[in-house]
Amino acid sequence: MCKQASETWIWTELLAFDCDSPDCGVKAYIDRMGFVPTGISCLTSAVDFVLLYQGMDEEYELFPDVCARFGHNRNEERERQKWTNFDLRKLVKELHKYNIKVFVSVFILNLHNKYHEEFVSLHPEIRLGDKRYGLDNAVSFLSCLSDGTLFEDIFIPNLVKVVKDYGFDGWHGADGTGPGWNLTHSDSSDGFVFRFAEYLGKEKLPAKYLQKADHSEEAMSERLDYIWRNFRNEWAKFTSDCWVRLWGKAVKAMHDINCEVMINSPFAKSIFESIFYFGLDYRDLNDIGIDYLLTESVTTSCSLNYGNYERVFDFSAMIAEMRAILPKMKVIVMPGVKDVVESYDALRHAPCRLERDIFANVNQSIFDGSRAHRAADGHLICLGDGISPEEWHHLSEIKEMSFGFDTEKAGDMMWLISPEIFDPLVREYESFGTMPPYQFPAVLAETQNLDISCVTLPQNMDKTDQPLFVPMFNLYSDEVKKQILNRRSLTILMGRLEDAGLPENIKCIKCRLAKDYTLFCALLNTGDYEEKIIPSDFPAEKFDWRPTYLKFISTRIPRTEIPAEFFNAAGELIRSNISPSPLLNPQDGVTQMRFYDSDGVEWVALLSHRDTYTVARYQVPADCRIEKKSPFPYSPVYSADGLLALAEHRSPLHLPPRGIILINIRKNS
């Protein structure tokens, strides 16, 4: 079988290239990479690159904050150069000679006229009101000019001119262009709030909040708190409708000139979190023709910057969820590789972790009714400047390891998701602080070594006899619930199941999390009854979703905490009813991912979650051939006394610290 096609994208500043070179440094850049990527998103950074576009009649220098992000001085290779509009147009032409797609991207932050008189200084009404950063920090793409013109109706026509004149192949909507920042702290500006008041009905907001407040960050903050606590659903719906309208216009404008669009998912890690906290319902974007969804799965850089917990499990499950709910977009995974401005470099400071995280992110699967497919259509290197030839070679090795095989079947079980559960989940979350659905398989993978890396939809769940894990069973429609309960193979339900109409012969774990909230883990089709109750000191106070949630990048959303004992008991119960794990020591910080291709070859990824070398005690049959597919270890591996080992097995086979080993296993027969 041919390998599933995958795309390789690079997001980079102009610092990756050389405007003084005859070909703008394109050949040297490609030679350094050692491959030709599918596409490059050219980070021109300043939104004024579009808003203050001067055309192509004359040559002129581009703003310093176009030539380098925020106008910073240099990267490892060169100082910021003085690019002109003609230079950049030439760069696009040179990249096209290699059949590379070239998209353009900008950010929303302003620099207070540091390098030029900015559009926002001429139109202060488009500033994004933010209770953390103040009013004069960024441009709001959902704003309105004082004459009533929507910002998007200025930006998109100018974007069309920029894309056509420079020869770009599309627009990459980066951070802040959908979704924006967290609804609990933006947009609190007069312009946006007054439009919301019209949408809501002016009489519903107290008169004090209909007064201008742009002069006072304290007044803006108080007004936003009131809206968040009293009109959260309406606030989120209004904001989402604005984003969907903007993206609908952008898609039409780009497609009309035979160009494409890519949308970022910064900050918002899942469908539900985006609906509730960021005011963008991705489900409404699925049908408007967006070509690419760039999932900002920056697990390595987040873990390095913020610590606390592993993010690879959450982000991996999120990618699977996004693929299932948004089937009409290509899903591109974005690992955070390095960034001069944000001051991190996973290639040099955490290469093992980067290798592991890219593999885990891109190798989530979706079952389509006949077989499993890789959920990711490709990956994007962020950012792609200042990388040495040796580092590019390592990135190519990671790609070959991660995309080098096709999946026919994946994991210990599948998990179920559907667009229909997110509306009732909003109400459930407000009442109980319910954990979003993608976090259930993530927690079980992280803490119980259950490989739940394949997702499916209700219409396909009867086409497999693999065990099926159903988080939030209680939120499905009666029709889908009936379909789930009628399955013949092992089915694992989680959620509030008191009145779910479950059969009597089930195995069940229960844990009371609140006065009127008991969480169940119920196993169907096991043949006998078993019940275990996990004691819990649940809080006396009801869950409160209203406090401002600020640390959306570094923390998970507020939720009712579930005792580890519940997941331990659930994991033990599930494992006792499925095949035993070949990994004998998950307690040593090791997890596994297993895949099967169409030739019956088993692919095994062993992932470390410790900062030291770890030995994975992994059972392999003696009558098989084992082939190492990861860069490390450097010597062959084989079976010694039934366990994976080095050929010279006097020394143990080490997993790299927070790294990965990938092997495939072929039966000799």
Q: What kind of feature is each model-predicted range?
A:
Residues 10, 15-17, 81-86, 90, ...:
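Active-site-adjacent "subsite" loops/lids of carbohydrate-active enzymes
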Residues 24-65, 161-170, 288-293, 362-372, ...:
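Catalytic domains of carbohydrate-active enzymes, especially glycoside hydrolases
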Residues 8-21, 65-85, 136-153, 227-244, ...:
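The substrate-binding groove and active-site-proximal loops of carbohydrate-active enzymes
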Residues 431-516, 520, 647-656, 668:
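Helical hinge/lid and interdomain linker segments adjacent to catalytic or ligand-binding clefts
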Residues 34-83, 110-120, 180-190, 194-233, ...:
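Aromatic-lined carbohydrate-binding/catalytic grooves of carbohydrate-active enzymes
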Residues 4-15, 101-111, 172-176, 233-276, ...:
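Aromatic-lined carbohydrate-recognition surfaces of secreted/lumenal glycan-active proteins
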